[in-house]
Amino acid sequence: MARSISNVKIVSAFVSRELSNAIFRRGYAATAAQGSVSSGGRSGAVASAVMKKKGVEESTQKISWVPDPKTGYYRPETGSNEIDAAELRAALLNNKQ
């Protein structure tokens, strides 16, 4: 009998703690959502207009993809050549001497 009462106390403490955490988290999420809606009314429209304009500018620039001569993988034509870290280190050390 005493063992079952002890188990009930442990389970009830765990359930009440988890229930309290769930209620607190839910309240915080609802408050955060209300704050973002009320403060972002007008600035949200401005941001979306800027995003639309930026999207139009990006779509007008056409970037062609060409195969890389070393690897054979396709990459943007405007991309710069990558240098190996060991080669860069060797080049910098040779210039210092």
Swiss-Prot record:
Gene Ontology cellular-component terms listed: mitochondrion
Biological process according to GO: cellular response to water deprivation; defense response; leaf senescence; regulation of defense response to bacterium; regulation of defense response to fungus; regulation of leaf senescence; regulation of photoperiodism, flowering; response to abscisic acid
Protein's cellular compartments: Mitochondrion
Main location: mitochondrion
Keyword list, A-Z: Mitochondrion, Plant defense, Stress response, Transit peptide
Tissue specificity statement from the Swiss-Prot or TrEMBL entry: Expressed in roots, stems leaves and flowers, but not in seeds. In short days, observed in cotyledons and roots but absent from rosette leaves.
Disruption phenotype: Early flowering and senescence, as well as reduced shoot biomass. Short primary root with reduced lateral root formation and short root hairs. Enhanced sensitivity to the fungal nectroph, Botrytis cinerea and to the virulent bacterial pathogen Pseudomonas syringae pv. tomato, but normal resistance to an avirulent P.syringae strain.
Induction context: In short-day conditions, follows a diurnal pattern of regulation, with transcription repression in the light and activation in the dark. Induced by oxidants (e.g. hydrogen peroxide H(2)O(2), menadione and paraquat). Accumulates in response to abscisic acid (ABA) and dehydration. Induced by ethylene, more strongly in the younger leaves than in the older ones. Up-regulated 12 h postinfestation (hpi) in green peach aphid (GPA; Myzus persicae Sulzer) infested leaves. Triggered by cold, wounding and salt. Strongly induced by the necrotrophic fungal pathogen Botrytis cinerea.
Keyword check for Repeat: no
PANTHER family: LATE EMBRYOGENIS ABUNDANT PROTEIN 2-RELATED, PROTEIN SENESCENCE-ASSOCIATED GENE 21, MITOCHONDRIAL
Biological function: Mediates tolerance to oxidative stresses (e.g. hydrogen peroxide H(2)O(2), diamide, menadione and tert-butyl hydroperoxide) by minimizing the negative effects of oxidation and monitoring photosynthesis during stress. Promotes root development. Prevents premature aging (e.g. senescence and flowering). Involved in resistance against compatible pathogens such as Botrytis cinerea and Pseudomonas syringae pv. tomato.
Family: Belongs to the LEA type 3 family.
Identification of the protein by name: Protein SENESCENCE-ASSOCIATED GENE 21, mitochondrial
Lineage start: Eukaryota, Viridiplantae, Streptophyta, Embryophyta, Tracheophyta
Gene: SAG21
